[in-house]
Amino acid sequence: MKEKEMIFGIRAVIEAVEAGKDIDKILVKRGLSGELFSELLELTRMHEIPMQNVPVERIDRVTRKNHQGVVAFTSAVTYQKLEQIVPLLYEEGKNPFILVLDGLTDVRNFGAIARTCEVAGVDAIVIPARGSVSVNADAMKTSAGALHSIPVCRERSLKEAIVFLRNSGIKVVTATEKAAELYTGTDMTVPVALLMGAEDTGVASEHLRLSDELVKIPQFGAIQSLNVSVAAGVLIYEVIRQRGELFP
């Protein structure tokens, strides 16, 4: 198990990125500039590492050490690359089953979803590098260790990831209340990627347009939506049901 740690100081952070250390995110003091900052900015873009510009007071709350306006948080897991995972699944003779999460920010929901994915045999989870959850202590705890077992792919562009999946012969099925078709009405015996959004914002419009099919889970009560981890569980086990994998 990897321990999550913090790295302080702009030179130390640059060296960590260059050394290939798995960085979850970097906080940078608002208004920071200079040659070293430009170098760090270029590295974060190259390695697809989320960077946030924040007031210096926020960094001061993290540490009293000489941080020079920069602190990096290492990841508790090693992120995988989708373009490496998918070919490997085909090489192993698997029928790819991937979950894509668009804009999910609740780490406990993420952990619960990861736990379901691991138990159900989902091959990988895809999240965007920015505007999404990170694998922190709460996510690890809620996942009950699942995040150590299932590959997590952090992608710079979710749009490009969806296009890659489709070009790889994987059907992208998106859960949205805007759908006309029920989730039981689409064929998920083929290679499939389930795309789900956050409870409040749903899936981005551009990602909806890229999807092969839109599906919904029927609702009969007054509450407008299911918890996203519950909805993910429903759809994941529908894939298993259709594939005849309920009784291994």
Describe the predicted segments one by one.
Residues 9, 102, 109, 225-227:
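Active-site helix-initiating loop/hinge in glycosyltransferases
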